[in-house]
Amino acid sequence: MLPMLVFFACSKGGKDMHFGIISDTTIRLSADDTQAEIDIEANVDWAVTGGKDWCKPDVVRGSGDRKVKLTIKPNTTSGSRDVTLTVGSVLGSVDIYVEQAGVTTGYAEGAYKAAETNRQTNPVNIVIMGDGFTAADLEQGGAYDQAMDRAREAFFDIEPFKSYRNYFNVYYVYAESEDRGATYGWGYDGSTKLTFAFTERNTAFKATFSTSANSTATSCNYQKVFDYARKIPAIKVGADIVLKPDGNIQSGAISDVNNVINKTLIILVINDTRYAGTCVMYPTGAAIGMCPMSTAVGNMSFEATLRHEAGGHGFGKFTDEYIYYPGAIPQTDASGYSVNEIQQWQGLGFYKNMSTVKTKAGAPEEWQPFLDNAAIYPEVGFFEGGCTYALGIWRAESNSIMNDNVPYFNGPQRYFIYNRIKTIAGEAPTWADFRTRDVQATPSQLNAFTAMARANESGFIPLGRPIMMDMPL
């Protein structure tokens, strides 16, 4: 900034007199600045008045040219402060405005923090970050923190995550967007039956809702999400992750199934009220659950969406159990669910919540102990329909979170989640150990979930299928 020159001059008795300030008359300081100066040019007497305890001139009177030093105390408060000093002489006076900013209480772009640390050795890591939050939202305890806290509590407010919370470490990563919200390719919100115009918003991770009508599909800049997750030292292990333009794996740590990124769940909270959500999953285990902050209630709320996308798809590696089509699931289908696709993903440890055959021997291994203990788990069996088809595919219970977002993981789903938690933690999972901490739904709760499913048949909007990268077909 150029200095603001304020100058007075006159002649008296044949003598020229002058007085002026040749430095800036507005001084702006950061919270930790400790000095400033006022540059006086004069051949007359002058005086400085108006100082405060935190802003004191080194001299208050003088004559002639002088650079008056201002001693500034650091501002340890969050609020800014200001003072006006006046430099006066017989020729006139000049006000000097001094403003000092408060301590910055916001998080820096790209900063991270450990929000919850439960284990020092072999923790199960969750990284939560937000898109569509501006600088004003990144204040400590502000909208960004509140959204991350809400996501974290929603994730753990369901079994079995609730019982095994002490196995998890949770991190927040802070990202600043120019705009709030997300880009609307097609603005239909199934929860409100409203259609919004195409809107492009400048956000950190470019969260975008589908261009397809009536779709809840969501996408983002997956490369940048992984880059930000790896700002955390505990996650930044191995070579930099490089994805292809379409989001599939090119190289780096994500290629190694044993790398920590493939044992870490990433949740992207999108600062938009639309009901939508999608999980992108990689065959090596990495996953990003994209969850807008839906203002819908019940099974289409933000919390319900997050548990389905992040807890069910992202961590559990489950597929969808809802039904769109009245016929049988095809053997092959390049654009949708098929028997071949499900079986191949099951070979990689995914989609274990569905069975492509109605036989105990052919069902996923996580179902076996439940089928062997029908007296203890009478709710578990073969229930036809799932993966969008009514026939030729079976789920383990009448209803679960992977159907219509009810707050319930069924028995085999809980067992698979338990197995994954224990394995990541370096502990051996066993059926006996699982049974000691399993929180089984009561018959009345199960009846309520079934009733909820029937009630939702007309009004519930199922979330779109997950994005499966590097599909094995």
Spans of model-derived segments:
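N-terminal low-structure segments adjacent to metalloprotease catalytic domains
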Residues: S11-G14, G102-T199, G411-L473
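Solvent-exposed, low-complexity, repeat-rich "mucin-like" stalks and linkers
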Residues: K12-K15, I22-T49
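Active-site-proximal segment of zinc-dependent metalloprotease catalytic domains
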Residues: Y107-N122, M129-F133, E153-Y325
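Bacterial Sec-dependent N-terminal signal peptides
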Residues: V6-T26, V90, D95-Y97, A101-T105
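Surface-exposed binding patches on compact interaction domains or structured appendages
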Residues: M17-G20, E41-K69
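A short beta-strand micro-motif common to beta-rich folds, especially ectodomain repeats
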Residues: S78-V90
